[in-house]
Amino acid sequence: MNLITTIITITITLSAVLATVSFWLPQISPDAEKLSPYECGFDPLGSARLPFSLRFFLIAILFLLFDLEIALLLPLPWGDQLNTPTLTLVWSTAVLALLTLGLIYEWTQGGLEWAE
């Protein structure tokens, strides 16, 4: 018990010291030169931060969701060794059904249409 108390005390103390030092050390002095974009030594012709397509963002979110689905369903073949393999199958089917319904909804709303 003393070891846990010691570790927690050291952790809290170290965190407080590092947070305090991080507020004291930096001398922030933003000027026009630091805030301007840098493009290989040339003056920028336009805005350095161009907006990207919202459709690209939606496709990226869908990719992440289905990538997560694959990661969740990858250990499914070993699910038959659990105590209740039918419960594992029911949960995995529910996850697949929910993601399929979401994909169908996105498709019907036109979210997957790249060109208008």
Curated annotation (Swiss-Prot):
Keyword list, A-Z: Electron transport, Membrane, Mitochondrion, NAD, Respiratory chain, Translocase, Transmembrane, Transmembrane helix, Transport, Ubiquinone
Top-rank EC class of the record's enzyme: translocase
Signal peptide location: none
Main location: mitochondrion
Listed EC numbers: 7.1.1.2
Transmembrane segments: 3-23, 56-76, 87-107
Record's subcellular location: Mitochondrion membrane
One GO MF term: NADH dehydrogenase (ubiquinone) activity
Gene3D superfamilies linked: NADH:ubiquinone/plastoquinone oxidoreductase, chain 3
GO cellular-component term (any): mitochondrial membrane
Membrane topology: Multi-pass membrane protein
Keyword Zinc-finger belongs to the record: no
Pfam families: Oxidored_q4
Keyword rRNA-binding: no
InterPro entries referenced in this protein's UniProt entry, alphabetically: NADH_UbQ/plastoQ_OxRdtase_su3 (IPR000440), NDAH_ubi_oxred_su3_sf (IPR038430)
PANTHER family referenced in this protein's UniProt entry, alphabetically: NADH-UBIQUINONE OXIDOREDUCTASE CHAIN 3 (PTHR11058:SF9)
Its job: Core subunit of the mitochondrial membrane respiratory chain NADH dehydrogenase (Complex I) that is believed to belong to the minimal assembly required for catalysis. Complex I functions in the transfer of electrons from NADH to the respiratory chain. The immediate electron acceptor for the enzyme is believed to be ubiquinone.
Annotated family: Belongs to the complex I subunit 3 family.
Protein's name according to its UniProt entry: NADH-ubiquinone oxidoreductase chain 3
